[in-house]
Curated annotation (Swiss-Prot):
Its EC number is 3.5.1.18. The active site is at D76, E141. One of its GO terms (molecular function) is succinyl-diaminopimelate desuccinylase activity. Binds 2 Zn(2+) or Co(2+) ions per subunit. The keyword Transport does not apply. This is Succinyl-diaminopimelate desuccinylase. CDD domains: M20_DapE_proteobac. It catalyses: N-succinyl-(2S,6S)-2,6-diaminopimelate + H2O = (2S,6S)-2,6-diaminopimelate + succinate. It comes from Brucella anthropi (strain ATCC 49188 / DSM 6882 / CCUG 24695 / JCM 21032 / LMG 3331 / NBRC 15819 / NCTC 12168 / Alc 37) (Ochrobactrum anthropi). Zn(2+) 2 binds at D107, E142, H368. InterPro entries: ArgE/DapE_CS (IPR001261), Bact_exopeptidase_dim_dom (IPR036264), DapE_proteobac (IPR005941), Peptidase_M20 (IPR002933), Peptidase_M20_dimer (IPR011650), Peptidase_M20A (IPR050072). Catalyzes the hydrolysis of N-succinyl-L,L-diaminopimelic acid (SDAP), forming succinate and LL-2,6-diaminopimelate (DAP), an intermediate involved in the bacterial biosynthesis of lysine and meso-diaminopimelic acid, an essential component of bacterial cell walls.
Amino acid sequence: MSLAVNPADNLAALIRCASVTPAEGGALTALEAMLKPMGFSVERPVFHDEDTPDIENLYARKSGNGPHLMFAGHTDVVPPGNEGDWKHPPFSAAIEDGVMYGRGAVDMKGGVACFVAAVARHIEKHGSIKGSVSFLITGDEEGPAINGTVKLLDWAKQRGESWDASIVGEPSNPNALGDAIKIGRRGSLSGTITVHGVQGHAAYPHLAENPVRGITTLVDSLLYPAFDQGTANFQASNLEVTSIDVGNKATNVIANKATASFNIRFNDTWTAETLQAEIIARLEKAARDNRLRPGRETPIKYELTWREHPSHVFLTRDEKLIGTLTDSVEAVTGKRPELSTSGGTSDARFIKDYCPVVEFGLVGQTMHMVDERVALADLEGLTQIYERFIADFFG
């Protein structure tokens, strides 16, 4: 049986599986069919949690004597939206002018397809690998991320698995293949502020207490001054207000409650705990120093709730992993990639607790968009980078 050496063929097989979270959609079955002929053992545990859908995952390993490299990623995708808006059907893997179209083409079935092809090519050329390679693939990255990578890592550890390094195949490049390797991620912390007032007629504000006055005051205290100016490896921490709501459609009524939600992406100046303390201190001062109605003695009354499980900031410093991948990228693309910590969170935030981890994949410009697509030349380029990395990593 021929091995899965062609990344475009691999990707087409994966795209044709409509694996919108939480559906497996046949994607893990297609991946298993690529891995087993190469001698991988494959297991597909299903994880459960209260009030969340069951999620099927895949863990595959090909064992050898030497270091253990994990490739991590996901085969689930976001919904395509209105399929009529697509140039080609989102699960058709249509090719036009050297470009493959389909949901998940870059995020991140393309990365999976390329790493499979890279391993297959290495085995065809060398017969074996001087170490162990595993695939840790979830179907829950685009969803709640509760029954996916975080549980799959623990499941594997309980079975005696350990890893020396990991690559996550997320689309790390902003504009062109070889732009950037992600060597860390900012932390993420979310919360909701609720201010309680007294409902009343807009024409008689002295009889009411407007919570909008309070919520804007508290929000303003979180926006200014800036939390920091950035660090050597990370950009400045940034808080965004994601919603403000009073649940009031009447224009002549002062609402009795207002809420504001926020998210902050933070750098290594902070831990989640120290940042929470800073936010609480700012809110306490703003609430103490201001009133819902001029002349009132009572400070602003508010509640603060945190979203569970904040993501912690991390930075990978493993010289072998970063250096080998950087050299591989340069050898194929001719340029030295930036070592970046920008962007949002990924499942690397879970893997960092088990082994050094970096992210490198395709160009992310069309991820989650209508007409998500990837150039076939980029698929070949990424496969060559991965193949060179595998050869050099295992020596």
